[in-house]
Every structure is written in structure tokens, then in C-alpha cells.
């Protein structure tokens, strides 16, 4: 599936996502993921890009998203999220493609440590092909929306047999409205 260029969305540009991924301090990031289950990637996106993505939640054409989940209905917490549709926004597709080759070795280490035989391919396209061959054809990237006091309980939205262990709660971009 190809990405949607969001040139009509101010602040989103087709950038060299691979260059941003290479600039990340991966040894420190890997260690943080091993020790804490999360890592901070400062300045992965600019403030303008974050603002443009955050605006998508309420202002995007409905075809941008495939479904909406109100977390309290499912015991997932307080707040809501929307799953993107294909084609994904350029920034989402670009980051997913660029970060995956760095995250796959971590996922493989975790599976080895847990005695799980599944290994993740080095290329994101190969993992997506594996998922699609198994009938898992819906995109899983999503955009969360929280108000003051909202929260997310630890949970997994499992969709089929093939699951990448570093899911969106491990790789999340937090947009903060200072107002």
C-alpha cells in the first residue's frame, strides 16, 4: 500500500525518514527498551509536524481513518483512538518503514529470550507481506486523543496471528497542547 502525501496538511512534508532513523542513538534506545519497555526519541518529529498530525484527529476526511475506539467501552482506559486507513499518511508510513529495521533486531532478541521461535524479517515490506498472506490486511497505526485525566491501561489490540511485539504503546509520539 502506498502512502498518502499530506501536502494539503500544513507542516507535514515528505522528508527523508530513513535519515531521521539513522540519527537515533540506537544503543541507548535499545537499552532503554530492554530495561524500561520504552524509550524517548526527542525531536523525531518537529513541533510543526506534531501539530499537523494532532490536527488530523478531528479535521481529517473520514477516509483517513478506518475505525474509532472509545477506550472506556472496552476497559482500555479513558480517551479514544482512531486507526488509520490505507493509504497511510506519508509521515506515518515513512516513520514506520524507517524505524522497523532498527526495531526488528530488538523484537528478535526478545523472542529469543522468551523462547519464541518467530523471527522478524529485516525489511518492513517483508513483515507486511507476511501479515497480508495470513489475511491481516488492515493497517494498525493509530492516533490517540486524550483529554486531561485520560489514561491508557496496558492492553494489546491483537489482530491475527502475526504480531510485532513493539507496538504503538512502545513507539508512541506524544503531542502536547500547552494550552
Q: Residues of each region from the PLM?
A:
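Fe(II)/2-oxoglutarate oxygenase catalytic core
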Residues: 1-169, 176-179
